[in-house]
């Protein structure tokens, strides 16, 4: 699996999402029990309860921004869009992440996250 680089062509966010899903699939093949248990755990964590799925995706995006995890930023920006979050909702989450994480978090939000919004629009993953 090739590494992801923001210097790739305009399709790089979709490519990165595919790379992540490919890596996850490879892990599940090699470690089926762990892969299945991880997926069950995260599916339950992101299921709507007292917080909606949209709110949980926005929280996860803020965490990914602060962790400087580009794959998770891409995945959860897409998840926010898929759950009906508006660009304003997403950018507000970026702002909260920046309030906590400073300039490093803000730079990720105004580059990686913005590129995801532009590339993915309202498609599903």
Curated annotation (Swiss-Prot):
| Family matches, as Pfam families | CMD
Which one of the record's GO molecular function terms can you name?
A: peroxiredoxin activity
Which InterPro entries does the record cross-reference, listed alphabetically?
A: AhpD-like, CMD-like
Q: Where is the signal peptide?
A: none
In terms of PANTHER family, this protein maps to: ALKYL HYDROPEROXIDE REDUCTASE AHPD, BLR3452 PROTEIN
- Quote the protein name from its UniProt record: Uncharacterized protein YurZ
Species, as recorded: Bacillus subtilis (strain 168)
């Amino acid at each position: 699996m090739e590494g992801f680089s923001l210097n790739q062509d305009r399709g790089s966010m979709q490519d990165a999402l595919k790379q992540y899903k490919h890596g996850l699939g490879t892990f599940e093949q090699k470690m089926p029990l762990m892969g299945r248990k991880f997926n069950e755990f995260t599916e339950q964590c992101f299921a709507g309860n007292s917080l909606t799925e949209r709110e949980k995706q926005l929280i996860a995006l803020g965490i990914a921004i602060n962790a400087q995890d580009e794959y998770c930023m891409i995945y959860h920006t897409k998840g926010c869009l898929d759950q009906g979050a508006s660009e304003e909702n997403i950018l507000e989450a970026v702002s909260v992440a920046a309030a906590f994480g400073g300039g490093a978090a803000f730079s990720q939000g105004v580059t990686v996250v913005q590129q995801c919004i532009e590339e993915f629009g309202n498609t599903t993953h």
